[in-house]
């Protein structure tokens, strides 16, 4: 893994109501370069946006990288570093033999991580962490902008 570009990625998701309009925010740093990504959906959940943020960041990369990825989502971090191994062994079922929630995004995140070396970090949200606060703002603004895009993987309980 020597010679890989070293990136810092910060991610956050937001949802106005849960479910409701949602958004994701990403700050990517490589040397002196900073890139921001964000997007919104008409109806989604907070957890889906927390998963979509790192997916969008990783899918934007054009080559394998060494990454420190920081999020305030324990759900996303624990899922990708711990729970996913059991889910995959059980054919995407939980230990209780229930289908994994948000499986479409977990599978996408799993695929997006495959070519990178990633150190997953957690930071407390709303605690003054500059990049996390910026991601929070990007995600919230995307959710508040009246997004019309449909989160096709979101299934409303009906």
Swiss-Prot record:
GO BP field: DNA replication, removal of RNA primer
Cofactor(s) of this protein: Mg(2+)
Catalysed reactions, as listed in the record: Endonucleolytic cleavage to 5'-phosphomonoester
Alphabetical list of HAMAP family matching this protein: RNase_H (MF_00042)
Cofactor note: Binds 1 Mg(2+) ion per subunit. May bind a second metal ion at a regulatory site, or after substrate binding.
NCBIfam families linked to this entry: PRK00203.1 (NF001236)
Residues involved in Mg(2+) 2 binding: 12, 136
Entry protein name: Ribonuclease H
Binding of Mg(2+) 1, residues: 12, 50, 72
PANTHER family, per database record: RIBONUCLEASE H1
InterPro entries: RNase_H, RNaseH-like_sf, RNaseH_domain, RNaseH_sf, RNaseHI
Annotated EC: 3.1.26.4
All copies of domain RNase H type-1, residue ranges: 3-144
Pfam families (UniProt xref): RNase_H
Predominant location: cytoplasm
Highest taxon above the source species: Bacteria
Function recorded in the entry: Endonuclease that specifically degrades the RNA of RNA-DNA hybrids.
Single GO MF descriptor: magnesium ion binding
Record family assignment: Belongs to the RNase H family.
GO cellular component, one term: cytoplasm
Species of the source: Shewanella loihica (strain ATCC BAA-1088 / PV-4)
Assembly: Monomer.
Gene that encodes it: rnhA
């Amino acid at each position: 893994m020597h010679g890989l570009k070293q990136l810092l990625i910060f991610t956050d998701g937001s949802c106005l109501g849960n479910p409701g309009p949602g958004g994701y925010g990403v700050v990517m740093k490589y040397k002196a370069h900073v890139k921001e990504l964000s997007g919104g959906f008409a109806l989604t959940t907070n957890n889906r946006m927390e998963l979509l943020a790192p997916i969008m960041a990783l899918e934007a990369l054009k080559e394998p990288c060494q990454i420190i990825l920081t999020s305030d989502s324990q759900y996303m971090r624990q899922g990708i570093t711990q729970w996913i191994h059991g889910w995959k062994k059980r054919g995407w079922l939980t230990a209780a033999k229930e289908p994994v929630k948000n499986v479409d995004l977990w599978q996408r995140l799993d695929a997006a991580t495959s070519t990178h070396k990633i150190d997953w970090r957690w930071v407390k949200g709303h605690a003054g962490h500059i990049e996390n606060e910026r991601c929070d703002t990007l995600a919230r603004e995307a959710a508040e902008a009246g997004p019309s895009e449909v989160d096709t993987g979101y299934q409303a309980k009906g």
